[in-house]
Curated annotation (Swiss-Prot):
This is Serine hydroxymethyltransferase. It comes from Francisella philomiragia subsp. philomiragia (strain ATCC 25017 / CCUG 19701 / FSC 153 / O#319-036). Belongs to the SHMT family. (6S)-5,6,7,8-tetrahydrofolate binds at L122, G126, H127, L128, S355, P356, F357. It is found in: Cytoplasm. Catalyzes the reversible interconversion of serine and glycine with tetrahydrofolate (THF) serving as the one-carbon carrier. This reaction serves as the major source of one-carbon groups required for the biosynthesis of purines, thymidylate, methionine, and other important biomolecules. Also exhibits THF-independent aldolase activity toward beta-hydroxyamino acids, producing glycine and aldehydes, via a retro-aldol mechanism.
Length: 417
């Protein structure tokens, strides 16, 4: 028998307890600008840390391979219904452990090994699972990659030409580091011209889509995948969505289980349900509006500080910065900003001469700082401090002074009270 007091984490494993405490401290004292990160609510974390973690539940709600699933069934059913309502679809699979797992399931459902897939190049802002040669998607399948035009938008002419030449079985519209708006209709027209399945990866913009502030990929796409964290502000996990296609939905069901996963993580699914409920509240729309406003506030200052922004600016929550003119690499800038209590990630830019481990760019975003309560004034401050450090990487005085100012700002906006 366990005692919550006697068997607490602090009493059981002091090393892990201390590591978590240090991470809590870091999250409080640092400004989080990584575009794919956010802060989950206490309710989401409570569900994820619940006794549902103990329950095995292979299969789907109402059709399990284990007994005793009547209560976890409630959680999964609620998660599905809320996801359907949030995105206006009639099918949602809430079981994928991650966005990559959701993408893998779609591949598994509609393709055979060796089939051709057309996706965005990693260097242009795509994701590993969109056909990168180091990923399963570029090893098992014949991957063809499209990029950006000189204006910084998706090169739809190139997409159409590559589709005509290679006849892909599936086209992926989505990104990991692109600050523009995707034209789903154009992608649909291109996909129809070669009879390809069209998949949208909305992992980065799902919250904006749910709030009606970014174009919904439906009815243009056959399937959409997303993570449940990032702009959705839920637990780390994946989600598959489709509409008006029961045959395809059936394939996705079996592609997840028994295709690539066994028992679902019921504690995470419960946490997803909570996050979806939060996202259905009117306040979530206000939050997403502020996410866009804050991204624009940072864009304004960074342009004034002569930091080059790929695609000329942002129309979503993220900005991809080309810092070549500073004389420092993305790796150097990431480390310097970390010492200044500003967390970012180094990121390749289009036609980057440096390796992905070094890079010439940084990717930043506004979801986490907006959750924290930052408005335009704070975001302008942060952008100025970021520029100060990026132009002075390794300058201990600048880094230390910035770290002090960041910590003082963070004290005014605690993540959790």
């Amino acid at each position: 028998m366990f005692s919550f007091e006697k068997n607490s984490l602090k009493n059981t494993d002091k090393e892990i307890f201390d590591a978590i405490e240090l991470e809590v401290k870091r999250q409080h004292e640092h400004v989080e600008l990584i575009a794919s990160e956010n802060y989950a609510s206490p309710a989401v974390m409570e569900a994820q840390g619940s006794q549902l973690t103990n329950k095995y539940a292979e299969g789907y709600h109402g059709k399990r391979y284990y007994g005793g699933c009547e209560f976890v069934d409630i959680a999964e059913k609620l998660a599905i219904e809320r996801a359907q309502k949030l995105f206006g679809v009639d099918y949602a699979n809430v079981q994928p452990h991650s966005g990559s797992q959701a993408n893998a399931a779609v591949y598994n459902a509609v393709l055979k090994p060796g089939d051709t897939v057309l996706g965005m190049d990693l260097g242009a802002g795509g994701h590993l699972t969109h056909g990168s040669k180091v990923n399963f998607s570029g090893k098992i399948y014949n991957s063809i990659q499209y990029g950006l035009s000189e204006s910084g938008d998706i090169d739809y002419k190139q997409v159409a030409e590559l589709a005509k030449e290679h006849k892909p079985k599936m086209i992926i519209a989505g990104f990991s580091a692109f600050s523009g708006i995707i034209d789903w209709k154009k992608f649909r027209e291109i996909a129809d011209s070669v009879d390809a399945v069209l998949m949208a990866d909305i992992a980065h913009v799902a919250g904006l889509v749910a709030a009606g502030l970014y174009p919904n990929p439906f009815p243009y796409v056959d399937v959409a995948t997303t993570t449940t964290h990032k702009t959705l502000r839920g637990p780390r996990g994946g989600l598959i969505l489709c509409n008006d296609n029961p045959d395809l939905a059936k394939k996705f069901q079996s592609a997840i289980f028994p295709g690539i996963q066994g028992g679902p993580l019921m504690h995470v699914i419960a946490a997803k349900a909570v996050a979806f409920k939060e996202a259905l509240e009117p306040s979530f729309i206000d939050y997403q509006k502020q996410v866009l406003i804050n991204a624009k506030a940072m864009e304004k200052v960074l342009k004034e500080r002569n930091i080059n922004i790929i695609s000329g600016g942002t129309n979503n929550h993220l900005l991809l910065l080309d810092i070549t003119n500073t004389g420092f690499s993305g790796k150097e800038a990431e480390a310097a900003l970390g010492r200044a209590n500003i967390t970012v990630n180094k990121n390749s830019i289009p036609n980057d001469p440096r390796s992905p481990f070094v890079t010439s760019g940084l990717r930043i975003g506004s979801p986490a700082i907006t959750t924290r309560g930052f408005k335009e004034a704070e975001c302008e401050q942060i952008a100025n401090w970021l520029a100060d450090v990026v132009y002075n990487c390794g300058n201990e005085k600048v880094e230390n002074e910035t770290a002090t100012k960041v910590s003082e700002l963070c004290d005014r906006f605690p993540v959790y009270k």
